[in-house]
Protein backbone atom coordinates (compact mmCIF):
# COMPACT_ATOMS: atom_id res chain seq x y z
CA UNK A 1 0.00 0.00 0.00
CA UNK A 2 1.32 3.44 -0.97
CA UNK A 3 -0.05 6.98 -1.02
CA UNK A 4 1.82 9.25 -3.42
CA UNK A 5 2.45 12.99 -3.01
CA UNK A 6 -0.80 13.77 -4.81
CA UNK A 7 -2.78 11.59 -2.37
CA UNK A 8 -3.47 8.73 -4.79
CA UNK A 9 -3.82 5.34 -3.08
CA UNK A 10 -1.70 2.82 -4.98
CA UNK A 11 -1.21 -0.92 -4.39
CA UNK A 12 2.59 -0.58 -4.35
CA UNK A 13 5.24 2.12 -4.44
CA UNK A 14 6.31 0.76 -7.85
CA UNK A 15 2.81 0.39 -9.36
CA UNK A 16 1.45 3.86 -10.11
CA UNK A 17 -2.23 3.16 -10.79
CA UNK A 18 -5.19 4.10 -8.66
CA UNK A 19 -8.90 4.79 -8.58
CA UNK A 20 -9.05 6.67 -5.28
CA UNK A 21 -7.43 9.63 -3.58
CA UNK A 22 -6.99 10.03 0.18
CA UNK A 23 -7.93 13.72 -0.12
CA UNK A 24 -11.34 12.77 -1.49
CA UNK A 25 -11.96 9.45 0.27
CA UNK A 26 -11.43 7.90 3.66
CA UNK A 27 -8.66 5.35 4.03
CA UNK A 28 -11.24 2.56 4.17
CA UNK A 29 -12.92 3.85 1.00
CA UNK A 30 -9.54 3.90 -0.73
CA UNK A 31 -8.90 0.30 0.29
CA UNK A 32 -12.32 -0.68 -1.05
CA UNK A 33 -11.63 0.81 -4.49
CA UNK A 34 -11.99 -1.74 -7.32
CA UNK A 35 -8.22 -1.96 -7.86
CA UNK A 36 -7.54 -3.06 -4.28
CA UNK A 37 -10.50 -5.45 -4.30
CA UNK A 38 -9.17 -7.01 -7.51
CA UNK A 39 -5.76 -7.37 -5.86
CA UNK A 40 -7.35 -9.21 -2.96
CA UNK A 41 -9.45 -11.44 -5.21
CA UNK A 42 -6.50 -12.39 -7.42
CA UNK A 43 -4.03 -13.35 -4.69
CA UNK A 44 -1.90 -15.28 -4.76
CA UNK A 45 -0.79 -13.95 -8.15
CA UNK A 46 1.25 -17.11 -8.62
CA UNK A 47 1.35 -20.34 -6.64
CA UNK A 48 5.15 -20.12 -6.80
CA UNK A 49 5.97 -17.76 -3.96
CA UNK A 50 9.28 -16.95 -5.64
CA UNK A 51 7.20 -15.23 -8.35
CA UNK A 52 4.72 -13.17 -6.28
CA UNK A 53 4.63 -9.78 -7.99
CA UNK A 54 1.79 -8.84 -10.34
CA UNK A 55 4.09 -6.43 -12.18
CA UNK A 56 7.45 -8.24 -12.38
CA UNK A 57 6.55 -11.90 -12.68
CA UNK A 58 2.83 -11.92 -13.54
CA UNK A 59 2.34 -8.82 -15.66
CA UNK A 60 -0.64 -10.24 -17.54
CA UNK A 61 -2.55 -10.16 -14.24
CA UNK A 62 -1.67 -6.52 -13.51
CA UNK A 63 -2.66 -5.52 -17.04
CA UNK A 64 -6.01 -7.29 -16.72
CA UNK A 65 -6.72 -5.83 -13.27
CA UNK A 66 -5.92 -2.26 -14.32
CA UNK A 67 -8.13 -2.57 -17.41
CA UNK A 68 -11.02 -4.24 -15.57
CA UNK A 69 -11.03 -1.71 -12.73
CA UNK A 70 -10.47 1.41 -14.81
CA UNK A 71 -7.50 2.44 -12.66
CA UNK A 72 -5.57 5.40 -14.02
CA UNK A 73 -1.85 6.10 -14.13
CA UNK A 74 -0.82 8.22 -11.17
CA UNK A 75 2.84 8.66 -12.06
CA UNK A 76 3.37 12.37 -11.48
CA UNK A 77 6.54 12.61 -13.60
CA UNK A 78 5.94 10.24 -16.49
CA UNK A 79 2.46 8.69 -16.80
CA UNK A 80 2.47 5.47 -18.81
CA UNK A 81 0.07 2.78 -19.88
CA UNK A 82 0.09 -0.46 -17.93
CA UNK A 83 1.18 -2.25 -21.10
CA UNK A 84 4.24 0.01 -21.38
CA UNK A 85 5.13 -0.51 -17.72
CA UNK A 86 4.76 -4.29 -17.91
CA UNK A 87 6.68 -4.56 -21.19
CA UNK A 88 9.77 -3.42 -19.29
CA UNK A 89 9.49 -6.52 -17.08
CA UNK A 90 9.03 -9.25 -19.70
CA UNK A 91 12.71 -10.02 -20.25
CA UNK A 92 13.32 -10.36 -16.50
CA UNK A 93 10.18 -12.47 -16.01
CA UNK A 94 11.04 -14.79 -18.90
CA UNK A 95 14.54 -15.40 -17.54
CA UNK A 96 13.49 -15.75 -13.89
CA UNK A 97 10.45 -18.02 -14.38
CA UNK A 98 12.32 -21.26 -15.21
CA UNK A 99 14.84 -20.71 -12.42
CA UNK A 100 12.18 -19.80 -9.88
CA UNK A 101 10.03 -22.77 -10.88
CA UNK A 102 12.99 -25.13 -10.57
CA UNK A 103 13.86 -23.80 -7.11
CA UNK A 104 10.23 -23.88 -6.02
CA UNK A 105 9.62 -27.41 -7.26
CA UNK A 106 12.77 -28.69 -5.53
CA UNK A 107 11.79 -27.33 -2.12
CA UNK A 108 9.14 -28.26 0.42
CA UNK A 109 6.32 -25.88 1.28
CA UNK A 110 3.92 -25.29 4.10
CA UNK A 111 0.20 -25.42 3.44
CA UNK A 112 -1.51 -22.07 2.94
CA UNK A 113 -2.65 -20.87 6.33
CA UNK A 114 -4.34 -17.57 5.61
CA UNK A 115 -8.11 -17.42 5.43
CA UNK A 116 -8.75 -15.76 2.08
CA UNK A 117 -6.57 -18.16 0.09
CA UNK A 118 -8.39 -19.43 -2.97
CA UNK A 119 -6.46 -21.82 -5.22
CA UNK A 120 -6.63 -20.68 -8.84
CA UNK A 121 -5.91 -22.91 -11.78
CA UNK A 122 -4.62 -20.06 -13.98
CA UNK A 123 -1.88 -19.23 -11.48
CA UNK A 124 -0.24 -22.65 -11.32
CA UNK A 125 3.41 -22.67 -12.24
Named regions from a protein language model:
Residues 3-4:
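Short, acidic, Ser/Thr-enriched surface-loop or helix-capping motifs
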Amino acid sequence: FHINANGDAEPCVFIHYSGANIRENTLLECLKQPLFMAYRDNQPFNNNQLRPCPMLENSEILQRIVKETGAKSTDLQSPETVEHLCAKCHEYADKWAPEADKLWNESTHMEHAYENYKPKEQNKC
